[in-house]
Each structure stands twice: as structure tokens, then as C-alpha cells.
Amino acid sequence: MRLAIIGLVLLVAGGITVTTGVLPWQEVAVLVDRVAPILGFVVAMTVVTELVSEAGAFQWIARHLRGWGRGRSILLWLLLALFATLGTVFLSLDTTAVLLTPVVVTVARQAGLPVLPFALTTVWLANTASLLLPISNLTNLLAQHNLGGISPAQFAQLMWAPSVAAVLVPLAFIAIVFRRELRKTYARDSTRPAQGISSKATTDRVLLLVSAVVLLLLLPALVSGVAIWIPAAAAAATLGVAFAVRRPKVLRVTLIPWSLLLFTCGLFLVVEAGQYLGASVLLGEVAGQGDGFLELLRLAMTGALGSNVVNNLPAYLLAEPLAGNPERMAALLVGVNAGPLITPWASLATLLWHDRLVRMNVLVKWRGYALFGLIVAPLTILAAVAALAVFGPGGLFG
């Protein structure tokens, strides 16, 4: 509800800039042409992930992960980190924050292990692992359009090195700080109650099978080069038909992320007006120019600072005109994707993650979160930009 109110305020403010002529209608038309397919994809993928979760796919994986951990905390943690990374890369960071967080917390509780290292792993990877593919993050989709609509394979070729670095640094930090907790063992046959995961979601094997097939077909389609909203919409429609037959009560209008849509549309309008008035020119004085290591690091740090002060989406939109080539665009994405680890509002995924934790009676203090983030975020950005400078276009091994 809070997000919807903010979105409504932004939408009204954006509407005022249009009606008063501050933002010309022609610019609005260009903006709509750019973001409509992206928002269509976001809606479709939200429906897909919600229905897949209702079918019990994530819960099925969670039940097996505890067994695959072989009673060793470190192995279970690595498996859950892989789970969160793959979920972020292929289903987006918000999916990890909203749907995988309860699963990860429940698995840790069932194993009788401390929740904090697992919860932090989830939210950090939801952000830092969102660099590899366009579908991983809304900022990536916008960047893909800005880069001339390059294919997912070309995008991954640009981002693979910083993406690997951005995943490894937070994991290394957690492995060091929580080394005692991760040395523990657990009983593989634990009978602890599965708090936070609905048992009704696993009762329909037909829906579980349909969801698995849809996901197996959807993931390669999303990286095939076809406009991503098309396979996402087809997957949402297929699952919608299956649920209409098997569990029609699940199909409700709340499957569509109305608050997120309202917030995003309003934000796009306001930021577009700011760009039209020259906000990006002022930001350019801070972000600098050039594509050497220090220049790329400066741009990435600017994106991270803007993300933690305001939010990563407006930080990206305002700095986008400053990313004039693939190297600088990659550096900006490192900043706005891997940098929002300090303040609660830096990324929507972090707020969604914390909301899920509160619902499950897991206490994570923002002060401690920020202190950890002040260490992890700069180290992650430094490592990711270094990887970009070495392996990216024009780099030593690029």
C-alpha cells in the first residue's frame, strides 16, 4: 500500500509536468514506446512466478535441498546460495526477494540453523546476482534497450565477469563473518514444522508438473533473442489455463503487481522530466567521463551512491545518458545493481525481503544491515569493476 501511495504521488507529479508542458507529449510517447514492453514482461513474469510458487515448485526444491546438504551447514548454505543465484538470474531479483526468502528461511529453521547468514545471502544475491541477463533486473532491461537491443547472449558476454565477481564477494564475506555458524551440522531427518511454506501448494502433482514444464521451456525462450514479453506472456497464459481448470480460486487480480506498476510508471515520468530539464548534465559532473578503470569505478560508485540515497531505479535513469558506451553502461549497472546494499530503500527487492522476514518473525536490524553493507557494497563494486576492466570490451582479456 505504501508503494502504491508513493507511486500515485509520482504519477500525479509526472502528469503535472506533462500537462504544464514541462515534459513534451512527444517525449512521453517515446518513453511509452520504450517501457511498455518491459512493464508487460514484468507483469507476465510476476504472474508466472506467483503461480509456479502456488504449484509448489520452489517448495519441492527446498525439501530436497536439505537432504542434498548431507547434514553439513556449509554445503546447505552453498546450495541455497546457488538456488538464490539461479532464481535471480533467470526469474529476477524480486522473485528471489519475495518467493525464495520464505523458502530459504524455512529450510534453515527446519535444519535448526541460524537464519541470519541464510537471510543475508538471499538479499545480497538478489541484488548482486542480477547483473548477468536482461531479465535479471529492470535496470538491465532498460540498459539492453539503450545498447541497441542487443541479444541476451551479447548482454551476458558483456556482464559475465562483473557478475561472477559480484556474486563471489558477498559469499566470501558471509563465509568469513559467519564461519562458526557455517561449520555446524544438522539432522537430515529433522521434523521441525515448516513455518512459512504453505502445504496446500504441493498437493496438486499435475500443476507441479505443468509448472516445471513451463519453466523448462520458458528459460531458454527468454534468452533466445525473441522479444521477452512474448514467451513470458505465453507462459503466464498457459499457467493461467492450468490453474483455471485445477485451482481457479488462485487466479485473482492481486497476481498483477499493481503497486509496482503504479510506482514504476510515476517514477519514469518524473525522472524523464528531470532529464529533460538537465538533471543528467549536473550528475555528469560527479560521474565523470572516460572508460579507464578509475573512470568506470567513479561511475559505478556514483550509481551506488544514488541508489542508497534515493533508489537504484531513479539512480539508473538519471545516470543512463552518462553511459555512452558498453563499458560505461556495464559499470553503471554494477553500481545500481550490486551497490544498493546499505540503505533499506536502495532497492525494492530489499524492502520486499525485509517484509517477508517480518511476516516470519525474523528480526534483522537495519543498523547492522547497513554496517555490513558499508563493507560489502564497496568491495563488491571494486571487484566487479576490476573484472570488467580486465575481461570487458577493451580490457586485457576482453
PLM region spans:
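Interfacial loop-to-helix junctions that mark the boundaries of transmembrane helices
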Residues: M1-A4, W25-I38, P152-P162, T202-D204, ...
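Hydrophobic mid-bilayer segments of alpha-helices in multi-pass membrane transport proteins
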Residues: M1-L23, R34-V47, L99, L207-L217, ...
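Membrane-embedded alpha-helical segments and adjacent helix-loop junctions characteristic
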Residues: W25, A29-P114, W258-L260, T264-P326
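Alpha-helical transmembrane segments
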Residues: R34-T46, Q154-A172, E327-T343
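Membrane-interface alpha-helices at helix entry/exit sites of multi-pass transporters
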Residues: G71-L79, Q110-T122, I150-A161, P326-N337, ...
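Alpha-helical transmembrane segments and, especially, the helix-loop junctions at the ends
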Residues: T88-V98, V115-G149, P170-L171, S307-L317, ...
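Juxtamembrane and boundary regions of transmembrane helices in multi-pass small-molecule transporters
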Residues: A153-S199, W345-G398
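Long, contiguous bundles of hydrophobic transmembrane helices that form the permeation core
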Residues: V167-R247
